[in-house]
């Protein structure tokens, strides 16, 4: 800033006149000052506004990334639920059949066909088998559960609407993983290779009132139905007819051969 001052001019007069003039005239005006302020130089834009814009851009970018990640998560869940789980369910469900020689019903060996639907639950470690009504006889329709966690097998005879529970026979029933591998190996065709049939005989012993103690899988199968415990007969009798009085037969397979389970009442 520049300061400029102006002083008044002094006339060459005598002192007395000057005194008179100074006495009669008003006091001279003070020196005039003019302040000149130099023009301000144009300031560059503050960095603060630029920093605020950068922060806002980062926030928008972060929000966009969050939305994108959420979209990817939802898409992954959708694909997992509707494609992977559906494919897994298809791989664990089998509709298959087996051709076997029936040597139990008569002396003449006849070729029979057995169909069943199999659901294998690898994580829960159990198998569920549905045997529809046989086309040419040979047993009752049934639902069967092999619970490897509980070590139990349950037969629901659909014709009688009764449930029968017995200890799991691991010498006949393949574990879920082995049974699944067997069925996957033969999934290319409709039927398993031709095989044979064996027979096991059981007798009911007592009525089961506490079905919850049998486990959730068997409970859902047998709830609301008369349920009995079975025991294997130590010495098998010779039964000429599967439809003999006081006995019912269920034919099924959980291995490379067919099993006929005879369930008989106490004689």
Swiss-Prot record:
Domain of life: Eukaryota
Recorded coiled-coil stretches: none
Transmembrane segments: 55-75
Glycosylation sites: 169
Modified residues (Phosphothreonine): 37
Post-translation changes: Type I membrane-bound, as well as soluble, furin has a pre-eminent role in ITM2C proteolytic processing. PCSK7 and PCSK5 may also be involved although to a lesser extent. The soluble form of PCSK7 is incapable of processing ITM2C. Fails to undergo shedding by ADAM10 and intramembrane cleavage by SPPL2B.
Compartments, as annotated in UniProt: Lysosome membrane; Cell membrane
Residue ranges of every copy of the BRICHOS domain listed in the record: 136-230
A single BP term in Gene Ontology: neuron differentiation
Subunit structure: Interacts with BACE1. Interacts with APP. Interacts with STMN2.
Function: Negative regulator of amyloid-beta peptide production. May inhibit the processing of APP by blocking its access to alpha- and beta-secretase. Binding to the beta-secretase-cleaved APP C-terminal fragment is negligible, suggesting that ITM2C is a poor gamma-secretase cleavage inhibitor. May play a role in TNF-induced cell death and neuronal differentiation.
Family assignment from sequence similarity: Belongs to the ITM2 family.
Protein name: Integral membrane protein 2C
Native source species: Macaca fascicularis (Crab-eating macaque)
